[in-house]
Amino acid sequence: MSGQGYISSMYKQYKKVISPMGCRAFLSPWYERGGMYPADDKDVPVFTGRFNIGAVSLHLPMILAKARSESRDFYEVLDYYLEMIRNLHKRTYEYLGAMKASTNPLAYCEGGFYGGHLKPNERIKKLLKPMTASFGITALNELQELYNGKSITEDGEFALEVLEYINKKVSEFKEEDGWLYAIYGTPAESLCGLQVEQFRKKYGIVENVSDRPYVSNSFHCHVTEDITPIEKQDLEGRFWELCNGGKIQYVRYPIDYNVQAIKSLIRRAMDLGYYEGVNLSLAYCDDLSLIHISE
C-alpha cells in the first residue's frame, strides 16, 4: 500500500486496520489521550468499540433546482440544509446521551463499546464523544448534469467545488459543536430511487437528472458511461479524500473479463489508497434459465 488515502495512511502510521461498518462506512480517528486530535506524536487512534449514530443525506440536485426556482444563491440554500442535518445530529446525540447504561448493559456497563464501564443508572452521554455522525452525499453526477448539462465524466468541476464546500462547512461544525461529524459517500440502494421520485414530483423530468429510475450514489460516475476501469478510478479519485466518513470505489467487469487484468486493477486501486469493490455482470442461460456468477 502506498500510504495514500485515509485507510492506508492510518495503517502505515499506526499499524491500525480500519474495518468498514457495513459496505463502506468508516470511523474518523479518535485518539486515546487527545480525543479528536492526537495529544502528541505518541498518541494512537482507537477504532474498536466505536460506532456511527447515523447518516442523513443531502439531495443535491433538488437543492440546486430549489435555488434556481426561487432565484436564490445555491450555497445559501445548501447552508440551510446543512444546518438542518447538523441540528438533527445534535438532537440525536442529546437523545442518546440521556439514555441510561442499563438500556444495554453489555455495551455500556460490560465494556462492549469503547469506554463502556458505566454503572447501570449512569447516562451514556460521556460515551458518545468518540462516535461519529455523517452528512451523506448522493447524486454528485446528477448535480453536475443539472448545473451545466455535463456529467462528472465530462466536467465535474462544479460537483468538486460543492463537495469541497460541504467538507469545509462540516469541519467548521465539528470544531464548533465538538462532535465527530463526517462526510459519507451514501450507497443509497433505495434512496437513489426515492430521490428521483421526489425530484419528479417537484420539478418534473429533466434529461440525465430525473429521467432514469435512480440517481448515482455518492460521487460515482453514472453506470452507463463508456469509460475504462482506469478512467473510472481516476475520475472518481478527485472526490475520494473529501468523504472520509465512508466511501467505496468500484468497477464493473463483464463476466468473461481477463482475471489477471482485474487483479492488476485491484492492485492499482490499493496503490491509490482506495477501498475497492469489484462488480461482475451476471451471465444468463436463455435455454435453462440459469444464472452464473464467476468466483
PLM segments and residue spans:
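Conserved phosphate/anionic-ligand binding catalytic regions in large, soluble enzymes, centered on
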Residues: 129-143
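Conserved catalytic cores of very large enzyme subunits
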Residues: 1-129, 150-152, 156-290, 294
